[in-house]
């Protein structure tokens, strides 16, 4: 193909992507303008918690809600002491200034995530981010999911460049939502990336120890009570994870554990058979939303890498690509938060498990060797 034709094709692709991004942004801006839950509800809980970090009252609900009520509706705090203490870097500012800095940091984190994730098509990632209602919800509510994505992307970028210790340290930044990172140790162990796993464990141990320094020896008990309060997860049936599926059955805790075993094994097999680190990381992040005990609609921003990899790879069948494109629309989010959560759960959980299983079956039939650890 002549160079001029290549240039024309490239320009058309960029224009189409720009149009798609503009349409997605317009849709999400309209959603934000009609938001009924209030802006920065989650940021408000982080702001209040950071003011109490180090006082021994971080999980004292009366103290927390008194501070939260100054700015927005009250939400129960669920962050570890070291996370709440670190948020003082922003939350020591006046509330409006802290809001602006938090939003700016979130936007930068999302941009770096899209640029840094190994192997991700940047144009498709930009379109996916602009169309993603979970990303928009996270920004509107002031969630810390963007910082989780930043830590994950930085970790896998360093891992792809042969810097496993730096990668492990970066993974520890996912401590803000540690339950969603449960797929990462499975990936690192499956691919025998022991240096990165050891570094992540060491960094995590340091952060855990720092939590005792911040909040005293009794914080684990107070934290356990806080996260098991009925008001902490009032919308558990609307989550798209194993906990939500087990919610309707007898002995839901035992059912969730039993369901987690084959899902963890599927992720292990997927990571063993996938030589592309970016794709394996995408599967681990997506599986974390299924295995994690707690996760709302905004947390499904973690699916974006797997959705983009599914769309960008020519060998993926059209029916699986179409499923991924459907998940990039507002449909699953609206189903989860609306009156049809079970349909949303089937769409989200079904896609993640199907994508991992398809990859395992293809790699098994092709006889691909396991990836070489960095």
Where are these regions (language model features)?
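Hydrophobic alpha-helical transmembrane segments of integral membrane proteins
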Residues: 130-131, 174, 181-182, 258, ...
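Transmembrane helices and adjacent periplasmic/lumenal helix-loop junctions
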Residues: 171-187, 292-299
């Amino acid at each position: 193909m002549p160079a001029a034709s290549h240039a024309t094709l490239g320009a058309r692709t960029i224009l189409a992507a720009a149009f798609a991004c503009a349409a997605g942004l317009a849709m999400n801006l309209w959603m934000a303008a009609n938001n009924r839950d209030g802006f920065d509800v989650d940021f408000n809980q982080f702001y209040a918690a950071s003011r109490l970090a180090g006082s021994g009252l971080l999980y004292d609900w009366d103290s927390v809600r008194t501070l939260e009520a100054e700015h927005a509706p009250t939400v129960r705090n669920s962050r570890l002491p070291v996370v709440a203490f670190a948020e003082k870097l922003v939350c020591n500012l006046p509330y409006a200034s802290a809001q602006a800095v938090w939003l700016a940091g979130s936007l930068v984190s999302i941009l770096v995530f899209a640029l840094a994730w190994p192997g991700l098509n940047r144009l498709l990632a930009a379109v996916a981010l602009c169309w993603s209602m979970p990303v928009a919800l996270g920004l509107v509510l002031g969630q810390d999911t963007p910082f989780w994505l930043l830590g994950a992307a930085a970790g896998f970028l360093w891992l792809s460049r042969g810097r496993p210790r730096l990668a492990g340290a970066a993974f520890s930044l996912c401590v803000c939502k540690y339950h969603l990172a449960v797929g990462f140790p499975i990936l690192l162990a499956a691919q025998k990336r022991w240096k990165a796993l050891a570094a992540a464990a060491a960094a995590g141990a340091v952060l855990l120890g720092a939590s005792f320094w911040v909040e005293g020896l009794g914080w684990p008990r107070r934290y356990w009570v806080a996260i098991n309060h009925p008001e902490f997860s009032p919308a558990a049936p609307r989550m798209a994870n194993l906990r939500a599926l087990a919610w309707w059955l007898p002995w839901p805790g035992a059912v969730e554990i039993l369901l987690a075993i084959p899902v963890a094994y599927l992720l292990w097999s997927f990571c063993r058979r996938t030589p592309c680190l970016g794709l394996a990381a995408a599967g681990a992040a997506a599986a974390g939303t299924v295995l994690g005990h707690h996760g709302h609609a905004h947390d499904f921003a973690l699916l974006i890498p797997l959705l983009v990899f599914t769309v960008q790879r020519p060998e993926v069948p059209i029916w699986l690509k179409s499923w991924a494109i459907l998940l990039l629309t507002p449909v699953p989010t609206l189903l989860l938060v609306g009156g049809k959560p079970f349909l949303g759960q089937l769409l989200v959980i079904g896609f993640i498990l199907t994508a991992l299983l398809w990859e395992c079956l293809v790699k098994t039939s092709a006889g691909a060797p396991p990836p070489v650890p960095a």
